[in-house]
């Protein structure tokens, strides 16, 4: 939340930037809006906004469906004048991989969620180079 930004800023005084992450719910977008405002006030560069859990990906057939109902996160990015980095759909395999000590992305690069993660990471890396 926005209350942690002061602490992060004191630990990393030359912060290159932050990535804001939200889910499609109105409450989450309200909270991230406060974080964006705080970062702007503190002159912390915002690399962009990621829409997390943007739908559900079936681990068997890779079809996507809605997970949350809410507002379009791209609209929030436009309103706040920050780059929209993309959306990452929820995949139940992420939790199972994490619990077993494995990395989801390494084993699932070709999945819908893996490709979405890769796309977002490429945009972040391009932004900070």
What are these regions (language model features)?
Residues 2, 25, 53-54:
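Glycine-rich beta-alpha junction loops
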Residues 5-26:
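Inter-motif core of Ras-like GTPase G domains
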Residues 25-31, 66-67:
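Active-site glycine- and acidic-residue-rich loops that bind
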Residues 36-129:
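C-terminal lobe/tail of nucleotide-utilizing enzymes
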Residues 1-6, 29-31:
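Short glycine/serine/threonine-rich phosphate/pyrophosphate-binding segments
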């Amino acid at each position: 939340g926005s209350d942690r930004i002061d602490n992060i800023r004191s630990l990393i005084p030359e912060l290159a930037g932050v990535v804001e992450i939200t889910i499609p719910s109105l409450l989450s977008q309200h909270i991230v809006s406060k974080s964006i405002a705080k970062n702007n006030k503190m002159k912390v560069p915002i690399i962009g906004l990621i829409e997390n859990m943007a739908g559900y990906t079936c681990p068997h057939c890779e079809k996507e469906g809605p997970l949350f109902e809410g507002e379009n996160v791209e609209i929030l990015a436009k309103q706040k004048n920050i780059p929209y980095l993309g959306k990452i759909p929820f995949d139940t395999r992420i939790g199972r991989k994490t619990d077993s000590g494995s990395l989801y992305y390494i084993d699932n690069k070709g999945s819908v969620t893996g490709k979405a993660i890769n796309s977002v990471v490429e945009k972040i890396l391009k932004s900070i180079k």
